[in-house]
Amino acid sequence: MAPRIRVLAALDQARTQYYHFKAIVIAGMGLFTDSYDLFCISPVMKIFGRVYYAPSGSVDGSGSGPGVTPPAVVSATVGVALLGAVAGNVVFGALGDRVGRRRVYGACLLLMVCSSVGSGLSVCRTRRCALASLCFFRFLLGVGVGGDYPLSATIMSEFANRRTRGAFIAAVFSMQGFGILVSSAVTMAVAAAFDHYTGYPAPLDTPECADLAWRIILMAGAVPAALTYYWRMSMPETARYTALVERDVVKATNDIGRVLADLDLAAVAEEEVAAAALSPPPVTTPPPPRPSYGLFSRRFVRQHGRDLFACAAAWFLLDIPYYSSTLFQSQIYRPWFPPAAKVNAFQEAFNVAKFQAVIAVASTIPGYFAAMLLIERAGRRRLQMAGFLLMAVFLFALAGPYDGYWRDHAKTAGYIVLYSLTFFSANLGPNTTTFILPAELFPARFRSTCHGLSGAAGKLGALVGSIGFLWASQQKDGAAAGHLPGIGMMYALFVLGGICLLGLALTYAFTPETMTRSLEENESSVQAQSQVGDGGSDAGNGSDGLRFHELNVLMEAATKSPVSMASSHLSMSPILPHRMSL
């Protein structure tokens, strides 16, 4: 292996500064939009049911009572967004490695903004047309959100220093918690305003303006994302992509010097040359060909297949109980609020959003912050195992006495505490670590793609959990209207707990630890093991030759102005023949 490029070492050792926190906010907006979209849909569907499923078309067919959105429609609105997220993870993850993180980052944000606005701007007033329009734009929203997952994690991992990389990526992911909180706040504000404006209508009286309320809630999710578009587009390409994928050390150094105030270009260059002087001169000076093996090639599977399986499988197993628990909220909050027949559409949506805000403040956000504090102390692997174990314990505690006790005592503090601890454990452990690990384990040229594949597996698990749980939680002999008979809530919770134990076992067997190591060290350890198995067949001096030649250019460029630096770089056509500009 060639010695490490010093600009990347300097990036690993850089002090935490303003730009790191700015990057957290910029990168976190996609996750913010994701959780806003996921959690606002429950209260939105309450209003939607009152508007488009009037009492005469209620689910039970009695012609009385408030309109209710059928379970199949709820599943469709959730499922299309998750399917879009699967596609977005795969497509934008691959594009992030092929054309650069920055180039497709803005496209994801624009797609999220436009589809959020489109979700509420449907001009249709009939039920079928409104549903078709809503599902179409929610699919596009899912594509944008899914694409943001690998790009946000990869960009933050490549900008962060070694000491706080895990905490920074966890901070990006914690924006989901604030998305839940803002979603609840916006829903409560809109519902309260419309309720007051319409004179607090009777429970079965749904004003025509309610059709506007749910649209405003959906469109409001575009505002925070739109506000960060300028800063997202002004970000430079990550140094690791520029240096390791585009193989342009000079430009990488220049880009990082613009955003990290304490990076001394001349000092970095001097360290590079000093390190090169201590190394034996390279045998070969021409640049080597770009790495020949591709994604899913035999060599890729040998070197990275185990890690990709560990990341994708853990994320898949996590999202089944995590998204199922999100849908389980309806069972939790129902005893605490008046029945739907005694409140109007705005009040029902307000109550659902209020409960979601309580859960977010009590368990979800504290779980994210606990992960940020512990990720660099306990490590990713230990936190993931601990989180899976705690989730299983709390789900079993809910499942065991459910039929005999919890079903008739749902309005107790212990019931909500156990449910909240399930969310806390997920966010403390696997919900955060499954987002971090794929951004640390893979080489720069596969990093975004592999993160996207892992995230896509997670969204498939979410699809299984969100749709499967709606069926499985129904009683065999007493399914709710619009549902097929299932296995019952108690057995459904037991299954979710068992899935968490399976995630624990998989993490123990397959997941490596990445704490305290640079991204290049994580990659080197995998390649070294592969080279030992191959008898060192991948060793060579070609990369040393390329690096030795670039060091001289780097030393010269560090003492020049940016204009001279660009001119010097452009004259290096024999070294980087495919690069035409900075």
UniProtKB/Swiss-Prot annotation:
Cytoplasmic topological domain: 1-23, 97-103, 152-165, 232-307, 376-385, 437-451, 507-582
Presence of the UniProt keyword Repeat in the record: no
Membrane topology: Multi-pass membrane protein
InterPro entries with a match to the protein in the record: MFS_dom, MFS_sugar_transport-like, MFS_trans_sf, Sugar_transporter_CS
Region (Disordered) residue spans: 519-541
Any GO MF annotation of the entry: symporter activity
Any one GO biological process: phosphate ion transport
Topological domains, Extracellular: 45-75, 125-130, 187-210, 329-354, 407-415, 473-485
Keywords for the protein's UniProt record, in alphabetical order: Membrane, Phosphate transport, Symport, Transmembrane, Transmembrane helix, Transport
Subcellular location: Membrane
Tissues of expression: Expressed at low levels in roots.
Transmembrane segments: 24-44, 76-96, 104-124, 131-151, 166-186, 211-231, 308-328, 355-375, 386-406, 416-436, 452-472, 486-506
Signal peptide (UniProt feature, chain positions): none
One CC-aspect GO term: membrane
Miscellaneous remark of the record: Although related to the sugar transporter family, it does not transport sugars.
Family: Belongs to the major facilitator superfamily. Phosphate:H(+) symporter (TC 2.A.1.9) family.
UniProt function note: High-affinity transporter for external inorganic phosphate.
Protein name according to UniProt: Probable inorganic phosphate transporter 1-9
